[in-house]
Amino acid sequence: MNIADVVSGRAKWRGIQWVLFSATACKVLADQLRALLPARALPGPLHPREVRFKPGRELTAYYDARIYREGRETKETCVRPIAVSWGPDTGANWKADIIKAVAEAERHSVAAPFLQLMADFPAWSMRIQVSPLDARFTQLARLSDPRHVRAMLADTYESGKAASHHHQTSDWIVTSIKYRPGRRHVLRYDPGDPASGATLFAKVYIAEEEARAFRREDGARTFRVACDVADAVAEHCRGLNCLRPLAYLAEDAVVLYPRLCGVPLSTYARRLNLDSARWLRRAGAALRTLHRLPVALAGRSEPHDLSAEIRSIVRKSHPIAVLLPHVGSAIEALLDRARELHDRLP
């Protein structure tokens, strides 16, 4: 089996499995990771988190990589998210942007234990990127730097951009929750002393001007819509609340969220009792409130109707039709039926 057959889709789903789990492919990936590390450091287990497949263009896998800093005999390890892409476009000419992103990571000393944060392996049409490298989200490096986080959060609370009674901590532990180069990033900030603060989450956005160029969400609009939705639910649904963001920091194009703990609604859905029914009714009331909100609240000029939704489903399910043709046919029939029923509506 070869990479060209996998990326084209000719190898079907077995090709994806081969790239992700075969001994040959895993050894190649481990060797490339080892080349990015100091002499004594070694890559450990790789845990796949997500896989994206664009037939004919690219296969991308996102891993959490455990790194042994001083060999496998030591207990000193760290976990770093990495993104691995296979395809003809992995060597695209974006060297200038990468150089800028690497320089930012070095300036904030967030590359260690890696000596380099990117590697190309042309023989396999493969590119590896290591968190926090991202040519499009260049602020990710500084948002991964505990020193910058400390200063950023101190300024946020001192300036009143976000209300807090206990965030005067001097140390923050930064963990990458979602590392998706070019697409999205989520970071977790834990106070070094749990008694001195609460855990926060940071959703990173492309700067507003670039977001328009790439047709991507911008943080300012997301923050505004989330706050408006939270206000609407609080007003119309007694005893229910939406997750309300704490602040939008334009300098870093990041939205801060508090940590919430609770039982997932899906857990209640598995139980058939009065308590489950009560929570499901409350969730339904919240959804009804959301559905009745003015469309203008989202701040979008383009309409989004059933046809637009179906186009989106068709686009996102294209890999299924390539890898599992019989499932793709079932999806197509289901969408045709949805169009037919929609046309009958008054």
Predicted regions and their residues:
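Phosphate/pyrophosphate-binding loops and the adjoining catalytic core of nucleotide-dependent enzymes
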Residues: 1-248, 253, 257, 266, ...
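Protein kinase catalytic-loop region centered on the HRD/HxD motif
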Residues: 293, 343-346
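ATP/adenylate-binding site constellation spanning eukaryotic-like Ser/Thr protein kinases
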Residues: 262
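Conserved helix-loop functional segments at active or binding sites
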Residues: 235, 340, 344
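Short, solvent-exposed loop/helix junctions and linker helices
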Residues: 180, 277-280, 346
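AMP-binding/adenylate-forming domain of the ANL superfamily
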Residues: 184-188, 221-228, 310-315, 332-339
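A cross-family kinase active-site recognition segment
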Residues: 238-255, 259, 268-269, 273-335
